[in-house]
Design a protein with these regions (language model features):
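N-terminal glycine-/serine-/threonine-rich beta1-alpha1-beta2 phosphate-ribose binding loop
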Residues: 1-112, 124-147
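A general structural signal for short secondary-structure junctions and capping/turn motifs
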Residues: 1-2, 182-183, 223
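A structural signal for well-ordered alpha-helical segments within the folded catalytic domains
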Residues: 15-16, 100-103, 107, 143, ...
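Short amphipathic alpha-helical segments, especially helix-boundary/capping motifs
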Residues: 23, 82, 147-153, 204-210
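Short basic (Lys/Arg) and small-residue
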Residues: 120
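A contiguous active-site-proximal alpha/beta segment in oxidoreductase catalytic domains
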Residues: 125-202, 218
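Mid-domain beta-loop-alpha active-site segment that forms a flexible
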Residues: 162-168, 203-233
Length: 233
């Protein structure tokens, strides 16, 4: 038995990132994936994937696709999810959904005293690149989560997953910037970022793509491009 098997974890979202990072870690360290939350439309694909990778004991909690763009879980769903989490004694959550759903799940787990590892960015309101009120929600949702966590942080941890802080390339760039600033005593006044993540989105994908999408009113800056902003801060 693994020393990590006592950690019962709920994973929210089984997308490409979760499969590449988290599932491999669960397998490597024999971590107990007690519960997986995803959309009803993904049921058969998820069951097939879990069986293929020997996660036969993992329970599924599926949510109707019509709720995927909400900012809070409907009471009937949150009540059922609370019961499942308590029954399975789950104390740790990894949120790896599309960013527009981050706030909904982060708020739920904070309210239920569950430790959280949240993929970056913290939140991504729909159409925040074209609607000023939606853009303001980035700060509003951040403040709301901070306030919630402030009242809970003696009991639980809430961490943001930003793994490229430890990437050799990013560390190299960061060190060069620090060296120049210190040596010449000059600030950084302008940054030009060009980033494509090694892929090209076809025109049709702007309307259909669900992984690293553009159709929800945010794009690369809220996905892989986020790491450059994180580096600068």
């Amino acid at each position: 038995m693994s020393k990590y098997s006592e950690y019962k974890i709920v994973l929210v979202g089984l997308g490409p990132h979760a499969k590449r990072i988290y599932i491999n870690l669960f397998k490597k360290y024999k971590i107990n994936l007690g519960l997986l939350i995803d959309l009803q439309s993904q049921k058969e694909k998820i069951k097939e994937y879990l069986n293929k990778h020997n996660f036969t004991e993992t329970e599924l909690f599926l949510i109707d696709d019509s709720y995927k763009d909400l900012t809070s879980l409907p009471y009937s769903i949150s009540d059922d999810l609370q019961k499942v989490i308590k029954l399975k004694n789950i104390k740790y959550a990894i949120i790896s959904t599309e960013p527009k759903a981050h706030f909904m799940y982060a708020k739920f787990f904070l309210e239920n005293d569950v430790n959280i590892l949240l993929d970056k960015p913290i939140t991504a309101p729909i159409c925040c690149n074209s609607d000023i009120n939606q853009a303001r929600k980035i700060k509003e949702e951040y403040n709301e989560l901070c306030k919630l966590y402030e009242s809970k942080k003696n009991k639980i941890n809430f961490m943001i997953q930003c793994q490229r802080r430890f990437h050799e390339g990013f560390i190299f760039v960061e060190n060069i910037l620090k060296e120049i600033i210190q040596k010449y005593n000059i600030p950084i006044t302008y940054i030009d970022i060009y980033h494509s993540d090694g892929m090209c989105a076809m025109p049709s994908e702007y309307l259909t793509r669900e992984n690293h999408p553009y159709k929800y009113g945010y794009g690369k800056l809220f996905h892989s491009g986020y790491h450059f902003i994180d580096l600068l801060t």
